[in-house]
A protein has these predicted regions:
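Structural boundary micro-motifs
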Residues: 1-155
């Protein structure tokens, strides 16, 4: 990658970050969309679409389901997050009482993905039969994607 491409990528990243911060600021100010505001949502096949808020049942249902995003970046992030969770769940099984339930963990001090055993069910955890299955999931889905979209860790 040459210097020009590098700079263009950085500009695009910064533009996305500015859009996200502006949207976050607006969301913090209002807490909800107002009549005539534009927002993004994810349709039934994972495409990101633009809509105008009229407060109709379609708008409010999207909002209540967490599928109304002020910034396109947030909708894009959510699509990737859903993809990663779906890919991990292909290796998963339901929580089993009194069994070793292997989960993924993120170690902030070492920036590594680890596995752990859980005897308690916890919302949001994805459970695996064994550490081998968990590591196969990591290998298949990608460690960096899991860190970013499952654990919400940047860099």
């Amino acid at each position: 990658m040459d210097k020009l491409e590098e700079l263009e990528n950085k500009i695009n990243e910064l533009a996305s970050e500015i859009e996200r911060l502006k949207a976050e600021e607006k969301e913090n100010e209002t807490g909800k969309l107002e009549h005539g505001d534009v927002y993004w949502f994810i349709n039934h096949i994972g495409e990101i679409k633009l809509a105008t808020w009229y407060g109709d049942p379609e708008d409010t249902t999207r909002y209540e389901l967490g599928n109304a995003f002020i910034a396109r970046w947030d909708a894009s992030f959510k699509v990737e997050q859903l993809k990663v969770e779906a890919a991990l769940k292909r290796f998963a099984r339901p929580f089993e009482e009194n069994e070793q339930n292997v989960i993924l963990k993120y170690a902030h001090d070492t920036n590594k993905l680890l596995t752990g055993h859980h005897l308690y069910s916890q919302y949001g955890n994805i459970y695996f039969d064994s550490e081998e299955v968990a590591y196969k999931a990591i290998e298949t889905v990608g460690e960096e994607r899991i860190k970013k979209y499952y654990f919400g860790v940047n860099g």
